[in-house]
Amino acid sequence: EPLALGDPDKRVRRVAWCSGGAQGFFHEAAGLDIDCFLTGEASEFVTHLAAETGIGFLAAGHHATERYGIAALGAHLAEKFGIAHEHIDLPNPV
């Protein structure tokens, strides 16, 4: 189940996004004048940092945030190098 933290009425202009388990980059991204940080996983310390900084935090699931990017990369490499490519998406609840 996705996790959304922050003020739902706050206007979001700048988003930092890193797929998978990148919640550890929240502190670094917070220094980039962002309004929201989107990643796959949450950690307890990040929920506190989000509240302290006023930056929205979205954890949409590790698998969910990586599945389309890796499929696009495979298709790109197949086209660029003329190789066969098949993306196999194995559902993962994490």
Residue ranges, per PLM feature:
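Hydrophobic structural segments
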Residues: 1-94
